[in-house]
């Protein structure tokens, strides 16, 4: 990979400027060691790797003896697409997994399995993260959410597989596209700078989401805890019988149970779920109930819910600062609307409190329940 940096005390660092570490179909079992570090410019896994603690660091880096990246250098020539590439038959199985890709625009691709049993998974990529496989953290012995969590930082995230945590899940990205499952048995903290597109399932006991825009087309965004959920948006459009708030009686969401890997799996054994395939329900310790704060979804610009569901078990309170168009169903505690237009044509509103101040209010063939305390003002 590169020349070592040596002092009188031994090897101080490794200077990586080229080279790839590839794991073939026979895999690599290092579970007998206390920790395993792969340090190279790139790494490809076509088989499994087993470890107690696994660190994979790729890019043109100076890496200290303790595994810390002390310096980086821009790549010369054509950059790689993936710094870490896990194939369909590849996988990582460990107590704790840390993946770092430092080269600009060079990301992480997982089509296989990434499974951590206790210490969680941390991914820091200076490029895109693509997950079409399974990325799961599950530990039935964990007593705190921080002991079994997923932490992801990437420029863009595309998920068509399973991304699931028994503890907290934290995602920091510029754009997020989800057609698979993103789930947490605790809290999902999502900071998305620009556009969030969801046609899959986003589910957590507590939702804490901030994004520039949200397009929920036939997707499900659900808060499974009993606490309240506050939803705020610039402009909101609820289309094609979309549902926001509590589900109508006698119906169910498209979501299944929150999912994850098989609790109790050790790092030395491969989970039985196929890569990118079936899911196993996560369990939490019933003797230590978790009390979480109210959830929050903040969309600074446009929120479009097209035949989708944004739902919670507790009361949902909604505010729109730049107009609202509802052609579906909303079941809310309170609704506050400001802006040019409030359009409830052919829509259904089930509310306790309505506070609307817009230039125009329209409800042709729309429904507003008679138990609502209303304050509607137009200019």
List the predicted regions and their residue ranges.
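Extracellular and secretory-pathway beta-repeat/beta-biased strand scaffolds
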Residues: 1-379
């Amino acid at each position: 990979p590169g020349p070592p940096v040596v002092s009188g005390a031994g090897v101080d660092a490794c200077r990586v400027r080229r080279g790839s570490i590839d794991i073939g179909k026979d895999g690599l079992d290092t579970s007998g060691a206390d920790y395993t570090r792969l340090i190279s410019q790139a790494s490809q896994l076509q088989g499994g790797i087993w470890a107690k603690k696994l660190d994979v660091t790729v890019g043109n880096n100076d890496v200290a003896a303790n595994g810390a990246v002390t310096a980086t250098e821009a790549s010369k020539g054509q950059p790689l697409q993936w710094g870490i590439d896990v194939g369909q038959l590849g996988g990582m199985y460990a107590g704790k997994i840390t993946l770092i890709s430092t080269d600009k625009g060079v990301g992480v691709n997982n089509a296989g399995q990434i499974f951590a049993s206790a210490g969680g998974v941390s991914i820091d990529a200076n490029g895109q993260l693509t997950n079409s496989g399974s990325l799961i953290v599950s530990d039935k012995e964990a007593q705190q959410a921080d002991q079994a969590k997923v932490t992801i930082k990437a420029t863009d995230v595309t998920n068509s597989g399973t991304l699931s945590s028994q503890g907290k899940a934290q995602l920091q990205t510029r754009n997020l596209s989800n057609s698979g499952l993103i789930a947490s048995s605790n809290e999902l903290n999502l900071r998305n700078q620009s556009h969030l597109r969801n046609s899959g399932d986003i589910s957590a006991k507590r939702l804490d989401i901030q994004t520039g825009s949200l397009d929920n087309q036939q997707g499900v965004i659900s808060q499974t805890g009993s606490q309240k959920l506050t939803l705020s948006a610039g402009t909101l459009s609820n289309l094609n019988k979309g549902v926001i708030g509590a589900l109508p009686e006698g119906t169910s969401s498209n979501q299944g149970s929150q999912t994850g890997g098989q609790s109790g799996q050790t790092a030395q054994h491969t989970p039985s779920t196929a890569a990118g395939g079936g899911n196993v329900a996560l369990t939490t310790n019933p003797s230590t109930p978790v009390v979480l704060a109210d959830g929050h979804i903040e969309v600074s610009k446009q929120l479009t819910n097209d035949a989708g569901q944004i739902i919670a078990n507790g009361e949902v309170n909604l505010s729109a600062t730049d107009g609202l168009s509802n052609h579906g169903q909303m079941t809310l505690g309170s609704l506050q609307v400001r802006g040019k237009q409030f359009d409830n044509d052919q829509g259904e509103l089930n509310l306790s409190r309505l506070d609307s101040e817009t230039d125009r209010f329209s409800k042709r063939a729309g429904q507003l329940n008679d138990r609502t305390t209303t304050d509607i003002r137009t200019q």
